Amino acid sequence: MKNLLTEKCISSHNFHQKVIKQRMEKKVDSRYFKDGAVKKPYSAKTLSNKKSSASFGIRRELPSTSHLVQYRGTHTCTRQGRLRELRIRCVARKFLYLWIRMTFGRVFPSKARFYYEQRLLRKVFEEWKEEWWVFQHEWKLCVRADCHYRYYLYNLMFQTWKTYVRQQQEMRNKYIRAEVHDAKQKMRQAWKSWLIYVVVRRTKLQMQTTALEFRQRIILRVWWSTWRQRLGQVRVSRALHASALKHRALSLQVQAWSQWREQLLYVQKEKQKVVSAVKHHQHWQKRRFLKAWLEYLQVRRVKRQQNEMAERFHHVTVLQIYFCDWQQAWERRESLYAHHAQVEKLARKMALRRAFTHWKHYMLLCAEEAAQFEMAEEHHRHSQLYFCFRALKDNVTHAHLQQIRRNLAHQQHGVTLLHRFWNLWRSQIEQKKERELLPLLHAAWDHYRIALLCKCIELWLQYTQKRRYKQLLQARADGHFQQRALPAAFHTWNRLWRWRHQENVLSARATRFHRETLEKQVFSLWRQKMFQHRENRLAERMAILHAERQLLYRSWFMWHQQAAARHQEQEWQTVACAHHRHGRLKKAFCLWRESAQGLRTERTGRVRAAEFHMAQLLRWAWSQWRECLALRGAERQKLMRADLHHQHSVLHRALQAWVTYQGRVRSILREVAARESQHNRQLLRGALRRWKENTMARVDEAKKTFQASTHYRRTICSKVLVQWREAVSVQMYYRQQEDCAIWEAQKVLDRGCLRTWFQRWWDCSRRSAQQRLQLERAVQHHHRQLLLEGLARWKTHHLQCVRKRLLHRQSTQLLAQRLSRTCFRQWRQQLAARRQEQRATVRALWFWAFSLQAKVWATWLAFVLERRRKKARLQWALQAYQGQLLQEGATRLLRFAASMKASRQQLQAQQQVQAAHSLHRAVRRCATLWKQKVLGRGGKPQPLAAIAPSRKVTFEGPLLNRIAAGAGDGTLETKRPQASRPLGALGRLAAEEPHALELNTAHSARKQPRRPHFLLEPAQSQRPQKPQEHGLGMAQPAAPSLTRPFLAEAPTALVPHSPLPGALSSAPGPKQPPTASTGPELLLLPLSSFMPCGAAAPARVSAQRATPRDKPPVPSSLASVPDPHLLLPGDFSATRAGPGLSTAGSLDLEAELEEIQQQLLHYQTTKQNLWSCRRQASSLRRWLELNREEPGPEDQEVEQQVQKELEQVEMQIQLLAEELQAQRQPIGACVARIQALRQALC
């Protein structure tokens, strides 16, 4: 999308350059000099400084105090007239500086130095200015069209880039948030299910073991019950161990796969960012070099006419230099690509090696654990067999009776039946629970899939709507520019160029030498500044790169130290656990060996108790070790996630710094203006075409190589993963087969042993029947003792289990609380980052708005000064011509010329009004589009940071529309009253002398500018003036309601040197046709239009508030009787004395305007506060909804606090809404009052 927009902008720019290529052939100097000063492009310093950009744009175009414009009119010939003019200039300059200081603050030393250099250049170019004024009008038209088109392209590119970056950032944030949430949910569900399964399994096993132990100790003898119990424990522990190993292997495999996938995606994203940044930087470097080269060719065109050979040699050298630079940049980029490829290969090798070492270490650990487990099983089996043989031998020696044999057989049959039914009941309960949980799991997956699909569809629809809206706006802007601006500019240029072609040929010889010297000086200054700017930019790049490398190195060093410390602690802990376990085993074995040497009959119970305690200790140690391993794995995962989050945050900050730097570089590079010449058009097209073909081919090659490398990496990774999976599955299969074979062999061996033992027991039981009566009492006593010991141990074991459950519940609650706190902290950080980014964006837009305002103001002021100078020269020429014509005398011709002059002046006024109206429509359209994009984009209110009370934007049209729309009232359409204007000085000359009509027609063909308020005439106390002549002494009738006091004091704001488009009126003759308008015509008025102009301001405010929607009545005198205090643009040539004026009405109107401004600012701040409160309430509601989905026991207090805050915010929203509703009617009155003031001014 971005490449398409860039190509479209370049094509439109080429079309624009083709249209104006004839105008730029011999007017090179008019692009760089204006009023004797060098017109330098706006630097990044002026764009970034919001306080002093507009003030210096105004000061740069002010005339110097040492060179006053010499008006040779009737009033400036005497000493009194010169003193009066000097006093007017001093007072205007004083008020200008006061206004600049109040609006923009104090001036910085760097800006003062810049202003001092400009003043020096003005003094140097004073003599040259007098000869160069003829080219100004053509320069103005060219620059206006060029600037309009360039600002339009800049705005379009800036908005496109901004929306693209915002969309990319939102998509990236959403993807990251979704991935993190999905991973957390999966891990949480797996962890919860595993904990539930382990707890349930443990409780079941404990209940089963306790029941069986109690039953067997009551019924069977000690040795038989012990052997059966240990056999069941071995089987259960083996099954649990196998299931735990399988679950651990699966979890490790899933975790390794997810980590590898995240690293792969992260590397690919970083690589794409680096490649795009390098391409963008190279593109701008090449564009800057080509623009500088074109400007150099344009500057050297005039000098090349005298010395063509030297110019060709210079072009050859410049081409070689830029070709070498381009070749070096290309080689540097190739080396950078090679370096990136090497780094990527090394990274892939390191990742594969790390994965292989981890896998190898894991396999070794598994093998060691299996070997240890087999050794423990063999030792346990041997000990069990030994004890079983000894118990059978004692049983054979002591059992002789047939009744005991029958009772034992009956009891054994009951135990087997009970065990079988217990197993069946347990399996049925487990199957039932699994069936109940299966639909819930399927429903959860279906809900997640449907929600994700709906969200994707909504995002896609929003993206398509935004794209269509952008395309529509771009098409409208292109059509408007092609239909209106280009034909008007081309027609005006073609008409004026024919008239001035002859004068250009005559003046070119005189200005050639001076122009060459000035070109040399300007080129040397430009070269020095460019070199210094390049050095500064390289220093900034080196500093940024050094800071990024230092930060990465520190983070890597800290992570490496922490990982080494954790690894060392884990190794020490494992060694300590192994040593402790080995010591426990050794002690138990010693105790058993020592106790076996005593009497067998007396110590059999103690030996069995010690062995049972040893088995319990081993089982407890084994369970504790497994839980410790699980907790360490969880802690390791958390630490790895924290490290990854820290790395992402560091990279995000580096990316933000790089983006800001790129923005600054782009803002600097945008200010360089490209000028195309007719001589090198074919050569430049060929070079651009070849460069474009080469770059497209290289881009295609880079894309293909990148796709091939990514495909190769993916295939290698997939192959390695498949092989690893196959190897793991084969090993697991072999291990399962071995376990099954061992289990079957053990079953067969146990059956044979049981059969032999039972046969021997059957034989020996006959012999032991006689000893039953003797041993019956001893057996009963021994059973009682064993029962008491079993009950005591069961109680202690039950207490331990309860304690473990409580600890586990507390750990889960603490983990959930920590997770909720971390999520809430991350959400607050993201919210603060978004608000800071929005504030920075609004601040940048305000900076750009003030810079644009300064440029428009500077251009308008220069145009006004030039028009005054031209009028003075025309006045002098007309006076000289009048002296010649008075000697000849022709009264009849003068009368005939007077009648002809009236009709021509009427036509001239109509053309002038049409030209001014088209100019105002173009400027108003640009201002409206800019204000809608900056202040009212999509109807969304801006944040509070965008309200700057100390700034005043002079584009009043969109602001009034926005305030009226916010207050609930429609836009008020106003019409300009047409009033007749006097003939003026030029009209009187044309009425007396018919030969001056041609000069008068050429003079009046130009458009009249507007006068800023700091060039207005001061009050009556400073300079008394005489009443005007030639029919201007008619009394002005009183006007009703709002317009009468304003028009009564109109000379305070509209003085002879402030020509407004609304002041043009129609003389007796054909009426001016009204201009068609589709909406309210909002003019771009200067600051002088809002100066106080009436004495009855409070009365007008009250009347306006009473009737806010009524249009102010327009007096009929404005359309019939000329205003004695308004002057025409032709009266600018002579400074005539006017009637005396008072400042009381000005002060009242100023107070009224300040009050209106305060009301509007208060309404805007209230609206912004309401928007921020609504946003805060929505965020609090969303947090409550998320918290209610997963409630916790400790979150109730936090939820109550958030609920109270939400209620307070809703109350505040209600109060602000009521306040806005109450303020709508006063705001509508203020809007109507401003419309009435503007209508009266027009």
Curated annotation (Swiss-Prot):
Belongs to the SFI1 family. Keywords: Cytoplasm, Cytoskeleton, Repeat. One of its GO terms (molecular function) is phosphatase binding. The keyword Transcription regulation does not apply. CETN2-binding regions contains a conserved Trp residue in their C-terminal ends, which seems critical for interaction with CETN2. Plays a role in the dynamic structure of centrosome-associated contractile fibers via its interaction with CETN2. The keyword ATP-binding does not apply. Its main location: cytoplasm. GO terms for cellular component: centriole; cytosol. It is found in: Cytoplasm, Cytoskeleton, Microtubule organizing center, Centrosome, Centriole. Residues 1017-1038, 1053-1081, 1101-1122 are annotated as: Disordered. InterPro entries: CACF_protein. HAT repeats lie at residues 138-170, 172-201, 270-302, 334-368, 399-431, 1148-1180. Interacts with CETN2 (via C-terminus). The lineage of its organism: Eukaryota, Metazoa, Chordata, Craniata, Vertebrata. Transmembrane segments: none annotated. It comes from Homo sapiens. Residues 111-130, 475-494, 641-660 are annotated as: Interaction with CETN2. This is Protein SFI1 homolog.
